[in-house]
Curated annotation (Swiss-Prot):
The gene is glaH. Pathway: Amino-acid degradation. This is Glutarate 2-hydroxylase. It comes from Salmonella typhimurium (strain LT2 / SGSC1412 / ATCC 700720). Transmembrane segments: none annotated. It catalyses: glutarate + 2-oxoglutarate + O2 = (S)-2-hydroxyglutarate + succinate + CO2. Gene3D superfamilies: Clavaminate synthase-like.
Amino acid sequence: MNALTAVKANTDDLAQRHTGFTLAPSAQSPRLLALTFTADTTKQFLHQVAQWPVQALEYKSFLRFKIGKILDDLCGNQLQPLLIKTLLNRAQGALLISAEGIDDVAQAEEMVKLATAVAHLIGRSNYDAMSGQYYARFVVKNVDNSDSYLRQPHRVMELHNDGTYVEEVTDYVLMMKIDEQNMEGGNSLLLHLDDWEHLESFFTHPLARRVMRWAAPPSKNVSHDVWHPVFDVDQQGRPVMRYIDQFVQPKDFEEGVWLSELSDALETSQNILSVPVPVGKFLLINNLFWLHGRDRFTPHPDLRRELMRQRGYFAYAASHYQTHQ
């Protein structure tokens, strides 16, 4: 572990009695907290937001904040400050969130509403060019012919940050499980940057801050390249990353070899967390210092997993990238 942040649970938040939800360290790491909305909170929230279908949230963006306020009010206005504090805390920065009573694909619209409410208590979800909305839903099946590893089930999707090929700052990533059938394997993989054994050697390398070209495949619906380094710093000078192996375009031998070594060093880390995410639950992580990926699935002809993602910016004091945004 690096000296940047020790793994130390925020005992004040964990010991506090919360209204409408429970909070505890996850089974995988004290950096990852498990937040669960009570059955009563879930029931009241869904009742109060039933008047707005997801289409209304798509068309009227202010409603996303409205339903966030409804959820926070049901939690005694304790939810929003806790979410912000946790996600901005370098020693944590990650939550596994669930709601009692939401656990079936038939509740897909309710899942989108809940995730939207939570995300818009911390900031705003960016436009997703792949879907044309502020969120994207996509399916992983046993056979895939797409142009990236996003939907390919029988290989590991390597650790990466989101937002590497867009201009918008991507502070957070939300990943929700909507459906799962005939599934074995496929856990989410997480690595906190400060737990990466090779951070210092790569962050101090001459290529760490070199501006590189990033280009997305056609399925992402992004027509122009962006330019930024792999590493940057936050407002306190701590390392942050914007990296994905599929979309970085090394210009020469030196960059290509270094990026290959970087990829190998990430994938062989002994501190990668393997996190099962059941239907109805979602991960919410700080994208600046957490990398995420997905383990491989066991093949099955009727394999199906549906996911929903949102990614966006913090609307409150945050450690944005200092350069090359």
